[in-house]
From Swiss-Prot:
Function: NAD-binding protein involved in the addition of a carboxymethylaminomethyl (cmnm) group at the wobble position (U34) of certain tRNAs, forming tRNA-cmnm(5)s(2)U34.
Name of this protein: tRNA uridine 5-carboxymethylaminomethyl modification enzyme MnmG
Species this chain originates from: Staphylococcus saprophyticus subsp. saprophyticus (strain ATCC 15305 / DSM 20229 / NCIMB 8711 / NCTC 7292 / S-41)
HAMAP family, sorted: MnmG_GidA
Residues that coordinate or bind NAD(+): 270-284
Subunit structure: Homodimer. Heterotetramer of two MnmE and two MnmG subunits.
Keywords of the record: Cytoplasm, FAD, Flavoprotein, NAD, tRNA processing
Coiled-coil parts of chain: none
Pfam family for this entry, one: GIDA
Domain of life: Bacteria
One GO BP: tRNA methylation
Cofactor(s) of this protein: FAD
Binding sites annotated in the UniProt record for FAD: 11-16, 123, 178, 367
């Protein structure tokens, strides 16, 4: 007899984990199926979490009640805040992970989660009736029934590893690929593309000459992704920086014909922002060297990840390359790098909830949707889990807008514009990045996480206390007048500021570019009384208030366009005067509102005007009828 669940998640990578946990935490009886229970939360590529934009996604997942932030906080070997010399909109955390410890911790979280079962099994078929998902069937014939299914298969769908002139069926890190499920999706009529990614060699730490490299330590202050973390890992391991050189490039040039990238062996499209070393050599042949970061894979292993040396060159050529790199001349290669090709769905086949348009109650998240990166996968996973549970429970779906979160930017880009290469989230993709900062992810999303039942009462009470403290401190500073005495003038002039002519409110003084919250306390002759994150919010919100308000005004304009809904079943062939390309793109994407329609590539302002007139005429006709 088939077992029954509310939601089934296929895959236990970074998307699958957040999907399964979100579904379970919303109260849905959830099953997670994975090819290998020992590879839950495996990091097949770089041993890190975070970075520009991506680190903010991790904070957003945490604010919604997800898991990635908490787990990396417990298992990292190093953490750094990036872009500290720039404005708050581009600051982000990046952590080096202990890969094995991360997996162990995440597996324990999953096993301990109420409402979540986990089972080893390979899904071969989707059980579908009348274009509605009903369950899944494994390769040994076991059936599991459910009201919703989330596919989070990463790079396993028809995966093929390529190394030199060798190509063989495989998932990442030489695991079993998923062939039958890939065939099943193609047979259902989904539009599929082939993408490619790669990984560099790993070398033995005992054989590296670190004296020829530059040390890259973590921050010497406690850092955390999760807003709940209170204990910090200060015993950190450094990374190391080295470079390729002319000799390295000569090895690549001599053997370029052996690279799967250039021999025609690889057909899939690779990631623009994480190219292989041979691709960097060809595309940037004027550069005398390229950075390589040596990243330990954990505290209890000698494996070191050579970040920046991703390659599909044969194993013997990889060894030759390593011999030319300062510090790695005598390094033992423990694992060779490789490229991997896999199937991905064209993401314009999805609704904003990540439900497929073709099959009702079937959701997809992660690399199957054309993205790259653990964080992008996890961000999609939590939203798919939230919405699959909502569908089963008859609750409202949840869609994050581009002004709500980087997760909203990511999903909107995918479903509206699609992608012809593995999609990487960048700060530059967000038009409201001053609103979507690392520091305010909790202020943006904790209310929603609480409404969804994924934030505890205790955590929500602490959050509300923080929010109240921020407001109270702003009001307090706005009620204190600073007099221009000699001591105050000296403090201001020491920072390069102009002297005060008259008294000024402390909050107004904080708006000056040279002033900080610390200096305001010094001027007021006060000591620190508030948590550092509260002080940070007071300073950022005050200094950037004008810019933030301008962004909020833009958001309001877009929201008015979002209120102009477009019927899902609108026949664009009946909309006169639309350009042919616009008509085709609109029919493919099926935008839910005018704002989304305006972001579709190939749809210009004239098309939007025509669409608006058509919709208004339709309303008038319905009223008259």
């Amino acid at each position: 007899m088939a077992q029954e669940y509310d939601v089934i998640v296929i895959g236990a990578g970074h998307a699958g984990i957040e999907a399964g946990l979100a579904s379970a935490r919303r109260g849905a009886k959830t099953l997670m199926l994975t090819i290998n229970l020992d590879n839950i939360a495996f990091m097949p590529c770089n041993p890190s979490v975070g970075g520009p934009a991506k680190g903010i996604v991790v904070r957003e997942i945490d604010a919604l009640g997800g898991q990635m932030a908490k787990t990396i906080d417990k298992t990292h070997i190093q953490m750094r805040m990036l872009n500290t010399g720039k404005g708050p909109a581009v600051r982000a955390l990046r952590a080096q992970a202990d890969k094995v410890l991360y997996q162990q911790e995440m597996k324990k979280v999953i096993e301990d989660e109420a409402n979540l079962d986990i089972m080893q099994g390979m899904v071969d078929d989707l059980i579908i009736e009348d274009d509605v998902i009903k369950g899944v069937r494994t390769n040994i014939g076991t059936e599991y029934w459910s009201e919703a299914v989330i596919i989070t298969t990463g790079t396993f769908l028809r995966g093929e590893i390529i190394l030199g002139n060798m190509k063989y069926s495989s998932g990442p890190n030489h695991q079993l690929p998923s062939i039958s499920l890939a065939d099943n999706l193609r047979g259902l009529g989904f539009e599929v593309v082939r993408f490619k990614t790669g990984t560099p060699p790993r070398v033995n730490a005992k054989t590296i000459d670190y004296s020829k490299t530059e040390i890259q330590p973590g921050d010497d202050v406690g850092r955390a992704f999760s807003f709940e973390t209170t204990e910090y890992i200060l015993d950190q391991l450094p990374c190391w920086l080295t470079y390729t050189n002319g000799d390295t490039h000569q090895v690549i040039d001599d053997n370029l014909h052996l690279s799967a990238m250039y021999s025609g062996m690889i057909k899939g499209t690779g990631p623009r922002y994480c190219p292989s070393i041979e691709d960097k050599f060809v595309r940037f042949n004027d550069k005398p060297r390229h950075q390589l970061f040596l990243e330990p894979e954990g505290r209890n292993t000698n494996e070191v990840y050579v970040q920046g040396l991703s390659t599909s060159l044969p194993e013997h050529v990889q060894r030759q390359m390593l011999e030319t790199i300062p510090g790695l001349e005598k390094a033992d290669m423990m694992r060779a790098g490789y490229a991997i090709e896999y199937d991905a769905l064209v993401p314009t086949q999805l609704w904003p909830t990540l439900e497929t348009k073709k099959i009702k109650n079937l959701y997809t998240a992660g690399q199957i949707n054309g993205t790259s990166g653990y964080e992008e996968a996890a961000g999609q996973g939590i939203m798919a889990g939230i919405n699959a549970a909502a569908r089963v429970q008859g609750k409202d779906e949840v869609i994050l807008s581009r002004s709500d979160a980087y997760i909203g930017v990511l999903i909107d880009d995918l479903i509206t514009k699609g992608t012809n290469e593995p999609y990487r989230l960048l700060t530059s993709r967000a038009e409201y990045r001053l609103l979507l900062r690392h520091d305010n992810a909790d202020l943006r999303l904790t209310d929603l996480g609480y409404e969804l039942g994924m934030i505890s009462e205790e955590r929500y009470a602490r959050f509300n206390e923080k929010r109240a403290m921020i407001k109270a401190e702003q009001e307090r500073l706005n009620g204190i007048r600073v007099k221009p005495n000699d001591r105050v003038q000296e403090i201001i002039e020491a920072q390069g500021g102009s002297r005060l002519k008259d008294g000024i409110l402390a909050l107004e003084l904080l708006r000056r570019p040279e002033m900080t919250y610390d200096l305001i306390l010094e001027i007021l002759d006060e000591s620190h009384q508030l948590p550092s994150d509260v002080e940070e919010q007071v300073e950022i919100q005050t200094k950037y208030e004008g810019y933030i308000n301008k962004s909020l005004q833009q958001v309001e304009k877009v929201k008015r366009m979002e209120e102009k809904k477009i019927p899902e079943d609108l026949d664009y062939s009946k909309v006169d005067s639309l350009a042919t390309e616009a008509r085709e793109k609109l029919a493919e994407v099926k935008p839910l509102n005018i704002a989304q329609a305006s972001r579709i590539s190939g749809v210009n302002p004239a098309d939007i005007s025509i669409l608006l007139v058509y919709l208004e005429q339709g309303k008038i006709q319905r009223v008259n009828n």
